[in-house]
């Protein structure tokens, strides 16, 4: 019997037609994140888990190293439920630490490397962390923290720890550091647990595994508590998605572990699928391009900044790729067409796949997939995810194609913000269906085929006055999507500033093609704006910028652009 179409996405769930019955009916795993990757790799112990600058670590070695780390943590007094703060990149040691803590039921609290010493101290205190682990590259901050918090146990990591010996020697010669201080070296730390015996802590539903933080582009960063169930739900759903993931595939990971995406997609997903995770730490675009050429990954995930650099550089052959996907900022349709055209010219048979998510849902709920792709959209929901578009004013569900706030009900939605029930209740709400839905603060729509389209942030809609003195809504994203069509514009971000006469006005920051006369290009873009935008949306000023500021989560940092505007104008 054919299912009746109601016209409401969350009831019809049209995206399920793309999935197998097995994917729809599959039970989600009930185990810790460590138990999950162990179960998935029982017959893959000789396979490569990590590839770090040519040092290839098998799954057998990988699990042994995790056990050593777990024993060392137990030796220094870390127990189930304890929190350990980590300021590091995705080195092998960092990954052992995350899963080693998970083995004994402790929680990895992942903080941004860019935080100041005082911010990290405040974080350690607020989370009641029992230990602090940090990279040698922030050693001065580390020493300041040790001085301020003399009772906390500290462990110093070096990015060269797992490099092949010849690279390690070269790195240490080039980066001589004063290693004096109270912190354990990783080697000495491991030695503490040599005679200790620990067992895996039994699985408890919704037990926390990691804490990651929102990027803070819309306010003070909040601690997002992700459980074992959340992270495993992402990996399990992707295993049923239409990606050609195979055990032994090379997955190039450039995403820092202090991002939700870095933990769920960068680290946990490839290990859960038995892939070889090629770890690359330097996110300077040209260095990423060089590494990409050398590694030749089958799967690669990044953001528009890196993607643009890759395509601007001379990468001739991309036939080896099966998945080329991205997150963070979105491309306009024009940019997406250009990217796909260039990719096809280089031998990649698919399309650049974009997705949608937020830190609060392990950074992913929707994604494009090979063969399931629609230009200008963010793909379809994962098989266990439901999406609802609601009217921001009355909370009523919108029909196909109608704009509203994007809401999700999913097994990968966080357990809550750390020690912040009020903010948790503001974003996760129980609807009349009795289910808990996360309210994203984003506007979008779902079409009859199940594809999600992003329209913009609710908070980034402003009021302005037109020349006729009428009040209009001002949408920065609308302006950006038009300006990027101009042949001289490479990147564009619009900020909105208060104005006594017009309430608010738009200011467009533009990275233009190199070598153009600034006055001429500014005038050309302004003329283009007047031709292609309604009068009230024409930017008051075009500000040319040599390089866009980006957050560590690969989003244009509009706060810095606002600061720059205030300082200069």
Which stretches of residues belong to each language-model region?
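Gly/Ser/Thr-rich phosphate-binding loop
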Residues: 154, 298-301, 311-374, 386
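Conserved ATP/PPi-binding loop(s) of AMP-dependent carboxylate-activating enzymes
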Residues: 380-384, 396-429, 457, 468-474
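Conserved AMP-binding/adenylation subdomain of ANL enzymes
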Residues: 232-250, 258-299, 312-314
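Conserved adenylate-forming
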Residues: 73-79, 193-207, 211-253, 350
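N-lobe entry segment of adenylate-forming
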Residues: 1-57, 61-76, 161-178, 197, ...
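AMP-binding/adenylate-forming catalytic core of the ANL superfamily
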Residues: 115, 122-123, 132-134, 410, ...
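Conserved AMP-binding/adenylate-forming core of the ANL superfamily
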Residues: 46-91, 95-99, 116-121, 226-229
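AMP-binding/adenylate-forming catalytic domain of the ANL superfamily
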Residues: 157, 531-556
């Amino acid at each position: 019997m054919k299912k009746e179409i109601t016209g409401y996405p969350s009831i019809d769930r049209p995206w399920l037609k793309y999935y197998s019955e097995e994917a729809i009916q599959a039970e989600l795993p009930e185990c810790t994140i460590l138990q999950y990757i162990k179960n998935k790799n029982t017959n893959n112990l000789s396979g490569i888990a990590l590839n770090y600058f040519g040092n290839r670590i098998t799954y057998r070695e990988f699990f042994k190293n995790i056990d050593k780390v777990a024993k060392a943590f137990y030796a220094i007094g870390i127990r189930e439920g304890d929190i350990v703060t980590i300021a590091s990149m995705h080195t092998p040691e960092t990954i052992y630490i995350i899963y080693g803590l998970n083995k004994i039921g402790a929680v990895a609290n992942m903080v941004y490397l860019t935080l100041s010493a005082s911010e990290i101290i405040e974080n350690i205190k607020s989370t009641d962390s029992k230990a602090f682990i940090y990279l040698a590259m922030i050693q001065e901050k580390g020493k300041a923290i040790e001085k301020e918090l003399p009772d906390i146990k500290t462990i110093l990591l070096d990015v060269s720890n797992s490099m092949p010996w010849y690279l390690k020697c070269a790195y240490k010669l080039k980066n001589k550091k004063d290693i004096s201080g109270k912190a354990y070296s990783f080697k000495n730390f491991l030695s503490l647990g040599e005679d200790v015996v620990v067992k895996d802590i039994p699985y408890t539903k919704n037990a926390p595994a990691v804490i990651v933080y929102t990027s803070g582009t819309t306010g003070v960063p909040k601690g997002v508590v992700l459980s074992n169930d959340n992270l495993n739900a992402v990996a399990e759903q992707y295993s049923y998605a239409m990606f050609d993931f195979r055990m032994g595939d090379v997955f190039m990971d450039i995403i820092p572990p202090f991002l939700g995406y870095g933990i769920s997609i960068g680290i946990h997903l490839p290990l859960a699928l038995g892939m070889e995770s090629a770890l690359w730490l330097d996110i300077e675009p040209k260095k990423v391009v060089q590494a990409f050429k050398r590694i030749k990954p089958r799967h690669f995930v990044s953001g528009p900044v890196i993607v643009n650099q890759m395509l601007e550089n001379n990468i001739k052959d991309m036939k080896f790729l099966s998945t080329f996907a991205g997150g963070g900022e979105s491309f306009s349709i024009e940019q997406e067409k250009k990217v796909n055209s260039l990719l096809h010219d280089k031998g990649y048979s698919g399309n650049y796949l974009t997705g949608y998510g937020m830190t609060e849902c392990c950074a992913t709920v929707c994604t494009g997939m090979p063969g399931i792709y629609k230009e200008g959209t963010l793909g379809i929901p994962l098989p266990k995810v439901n999406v609802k578009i609601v009217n921001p004013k009355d909370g009523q569900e919108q029909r196909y194609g109608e704009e509203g706030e994007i809401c999700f009900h999913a097994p990968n939605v966080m357990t809550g913000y750390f020690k912040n029930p009020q903010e948790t209740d503001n974003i996760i709400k129980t609807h009349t269906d009795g289910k808990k839905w996360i309210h994203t603060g984003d506007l979008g729509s779902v079409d009859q085929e199940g594809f999600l389209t992003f329209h913009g942030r609710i908070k980034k809609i402003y009021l302005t006055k037109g020349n006729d003195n009428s009040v209009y809504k001002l949408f920065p994203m609308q302006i950006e999507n038009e300006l990027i069509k101009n042949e001289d514009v490479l990147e564009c971000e619009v900020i909105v500033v208060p104005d006594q006469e017009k309430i608010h006005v738009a200011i467009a920051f533009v990275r233009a093609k190199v070598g153009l006369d600034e006055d001429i290009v500014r005038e050309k873009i302004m003329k283009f704006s007047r031709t292609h935008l309604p009068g009230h949306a024409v930017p008051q000023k075009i500000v040319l910028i040599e390089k866009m500021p980006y957050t560590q989560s690969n989003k244009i940092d509009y706060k810095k652009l606002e600061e720059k505007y205030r300082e200069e104008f």
